[in-house]
């Protein structure tokens, strides 16, 4: 039919473009020689972040790949990252949006995927001046601490049993966000029929779709066809997620119209008071839940993995907490007095940044970086994973050693380009202030309250520490532990 003819025309156009077109820029950064049609696609394996780090050893700070018809520039050192995220931040601030996520009504209202439009600036402002202020974060600390206590109670009931720890962490984080956003739990820990399992299925399916290969990302002419139905599936996931909290939003809107309504001082009240429309609220909540839960759960699972492998480090954190906190439960207000805990979080984020290549940027116009030409609409990736393991910056980069951050001013708040797990510049993760709090809180809660071992008497020497690449960097296989009380 007509669509088949159109598809053939697109494929022929792509081939002609690749053979006789190209970027037209002679001064691109160097890179491996591309093959006809597919470019460098077939040269990449399952762990591109690790391959990019190896390519940087050959080609230097920045290099070029041809991914189908797309020109991609990869930055692999802190100096190159500084050029992209600081010096040329404005010109390189646009987003490359994966074809699967180009859902009408979502991208243009998204903090993550939209370009730096007025809507985007307004949403960032709400995050910066309302949601993630120091005052707001401190006022809600008791919520996060209470959810951590509930997590410990749940794990106490699981003593001697095998527990997939990332599911417990994920559930706890969803409830933390549920209370910060809606002032209520989204589900009950350990109940497979509660709201979270449905929510989690939608969320993880979206992440899988984001992590899966879509030929249209490399041959954009195919984008309009949605050949594998990925965009349609993302739209269905979004619809399902919005339905889960749609009723809660409507209920709140009605409640706010009643005289004498007492503000709950949660994110929904802030969003409604800020005049955001339903599309903007849905997109913002989706990204707070999506980015906030999955990336943080993955980071905390990596921290638990490293602590399982390094019991001496666990003992040092425990000793520090005991000295500073004593017998009461650790609180977020204790963190300034727990430097070794803070160093452990930094070291986890150095070795295991939640988004290994950050999120792809796009050049708004042609510019020059490190004497190379970066053409307009070129896709730009920053290898945060490779930068965190760069032997020119870090001594023994593959060793997990929190000590390297003691008496060090290096931080991950976007000023030190050797440590950028949350990005930097105008597109730095807006939730960084709160993510830092609950990563540290969950790690401290585990260490203070629990002992744990691996299932079936497995030695830590046999613990597999492999990565599953995607938008987020997950541990493969997931960490299973057997918890036991320290009390």
Swiss-Prot record:
Binding site for heme: 429
Membrane-traversing stretches: 4-24
Protein name: (S)-N-methylcoclaurine 3'-hydroxylase isozyme 1
Gene Ontology molecular-function annotations: heme binding; iron ion binding; N-methylcoclaurine 3'-monooxygenase activity
One Gene Ontology term from the biological process aspect of the record: isoquinoline alkaloid biosynthetic process
Source taxon at top rank: Eukaryota
Function recorded in the entry: 3'-hydroxylation of (S)-N-methylcoclaurine.
Pfam families linked to this entry: p450
Reaction(s) this enzyme catalyzes, per UniProt: (S)-N-methylcoclaurine + reduced [NADPH--hemoprotein reductase] + O2 = (S)-3'-hydroxy-N-methylcoclaurine + oxidized [NADPH--hemoprotein reductase] + H2O + H(+)
Essential cofactor(s): heme
Pathway named in the protein's UniProt entry: Alkaloid biosynthesis; (S)-reticuline biosynthesis; (S)-reticuline from (S)-norcoclaurine: step 3/4
EC number: 1.14.14.102
Source lineage: Eukaryota, Viridiplantae, Streptophyta, Embryophyta, Tracheophyta
Keywords attached to this entry: Endoplasmic reticulum, Heme, Iron, Membrane, Metal-binding, Microsome, Monooxygenase, Oxidoreductase, Transmembrane, Transmembrane helix
Family, similarity comment: Belongs to the cytochrome P450 family.
Subcellular location: Endoplasmic reticulum membrane; Microsome membrane
A single cellular component GO annotation: endoplasmic reticulum membrane
InterPro entries named in the record: Cyt_P450, Cyt_P450_CS, Cyt_P450_E_grp-I, Cyt_P450_sf
Membrane topology, as annotated: Single-pass membrane protein
Main localization of the protein described in the UniProt heading: endoplasmic reticulum
Enzyme class: oxidoreductase
């Amino acid at each position: 039919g007509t669509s088949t003819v159109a598809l053939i025309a697109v494929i022929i156009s792509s081939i002609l473009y690749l053979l006789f077109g190209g970027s037209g820029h002679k001064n691109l950064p160097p890179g491996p020689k591309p093959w006809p049609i597919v470019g460098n696609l077939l040269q990449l394996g399952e762990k591109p972040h690790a391959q990019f780090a190896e390519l940087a050893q050959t080609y230097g700070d920045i290099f070029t790949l041809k991914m189908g018809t797309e020109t991609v520039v990869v930055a692999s050192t802190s100096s190159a990252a500084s050029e992209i995220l600081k010096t040329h931040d404005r010109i390189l601030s646009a987003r490359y949006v994966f074809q699967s996520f180009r859902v009408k009504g979502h991208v243009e209202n998204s903090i993550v995927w939209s370009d730096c439009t007025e809507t985007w600036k307004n949403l960032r402002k709400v995050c910066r001046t309302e949601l993630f202020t120091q005052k707001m974060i401190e006022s809600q600390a008791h919520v996060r601490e209470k959810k951590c206590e509930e997590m410990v109670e749940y794990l106490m009931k699981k003593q001697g049993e095998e527990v997939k720890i990332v599911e417990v962490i994920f559930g706890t984080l969803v409830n933390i966000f549920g209370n910060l956003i809606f002032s209520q739990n989204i589900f009950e820990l350990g109940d497979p029929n509660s709201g979270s399992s449905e929510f989690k299925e939608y969320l993880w399916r979206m992440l899988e779709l984001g992590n899966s290969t879509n030929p249209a990302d490399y041959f954009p002419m195919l984008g309009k066809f949605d050949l594998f139905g990925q965009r349609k599936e993302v739209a269905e996931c979004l619809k399902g997620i919005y339905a889960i909290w749609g009723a809660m939003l409507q209920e709140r809107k009605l409640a706010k119209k009643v005289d004498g309504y007492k503000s709950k001082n949660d994110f929904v009240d802030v969003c409604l008071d800020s005049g955001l429309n339903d599309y903007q609220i849905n997109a913002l909540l989706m990204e707070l839940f999506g980015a906030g839960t999955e990336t943080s759960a993955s980071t905390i699972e990596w921290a638990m993995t490293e602590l399982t492998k390094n019991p001496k480090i666990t003992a040092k954190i425990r000793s520090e907490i005991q000295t500073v906190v004593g017998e009461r439960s650790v609180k977020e207000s204790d963190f300034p007095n727990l430097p070794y805990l803070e160093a452990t979080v930094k070291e986890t984020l150095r070795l295991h940044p939640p988004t290994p290549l950050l999120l792809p940027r796009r050049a708004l116009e042609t510019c020059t970086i490190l004497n190379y030409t970066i053409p307009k609409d070129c896709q730009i990736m920053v290898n945060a994973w490779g930068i965190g393991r760069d032997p020119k910056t870090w001594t023994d980069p593959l060793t997990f050693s929190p000590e390297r951050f003691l008496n060090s001013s290096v931080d991950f708040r976007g000023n030190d380009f050797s440590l950028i797990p949350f990005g930097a510049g105008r597109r730095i993760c807006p939730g960084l202030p709160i993510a830092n709090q609950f990563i540290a809180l969950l790690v401290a809660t585990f260490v203070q309250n629990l002992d744990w071992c691996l299932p079936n008497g497995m030695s830590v020497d046999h613990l597999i520490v492999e990565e599953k690449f995607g938008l987020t960097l997950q541990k493969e296989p997931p960490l299973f532990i057997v918890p036991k009380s320290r009390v």
